[in-house]
Amino acid sequence: KTLEYLETQFKSLGLAPGNGDSYLQEVPMVEITPTADSLMQVKTPDGEFTLRGFNDFVINSERTDDEIVWRDERLVFAGFGIVAPEYNWNDYKDLDVRDKIVVVLVNDPGFGGDDSTFFKGNTMTYYGRWTYKYEEAARQGAKGCLVVHNTVPAGYPFQVLQNGWNAAHLYLDP
């Protein structure tokens, strides 16, 4: 019904079809439902700890693989995971992240500072968004990206991620 309504409205406004003789265009989509293992074990030279899926971490991916498995992967801390030449900032400088998992902080380095012009201060820039961090990690050759959540710089509690990312998501079909 919605498509019929929109098509009727377009015609009544005198708009010409934009896809040959049709007002409609097929948009192939894919549905992805990420599910994490129940545990993630992290080992460091100083010890190890275990994170519980959904309670301590959630996952997300736009990859359409049937299964993505990370086992015995190397983690590399990459600050905020940002390359921003206009701010003379490069968290990846001198880091080898190829085929590793980068761990980055949420938001950007301007948050909580006194300079409102540095990464726009407390106003999150595109560099602070999760999508940018995933894209930059991929550009740097990383296998994946883990974003460390912190409620204050994120602007929302972890429960928002638990509620929103534990469900199916629609993406354009690659």
State what each model feature region is.
Residues 109, 151-152:
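Acidic glycine-/aspartate-rich tracts in secreted/extracellular proteins
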Residues 103-104, 144-148:
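Short hydrophobic alpha-helical runs that function as membrane-insertion/retention elements
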Residues 38, 100, 134, 143-144:
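Residue-level detector of short, conserved catalytic/binding motifs and their immediate flanks
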Residues 115-124, 130:
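Proteins synthesized as precursors that undergo proteolytic processing into mature forms
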Residues 11, 135-139:
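Non-catalytic positions within long, well-ordered alpha-helices that form the structural scaffold/packing
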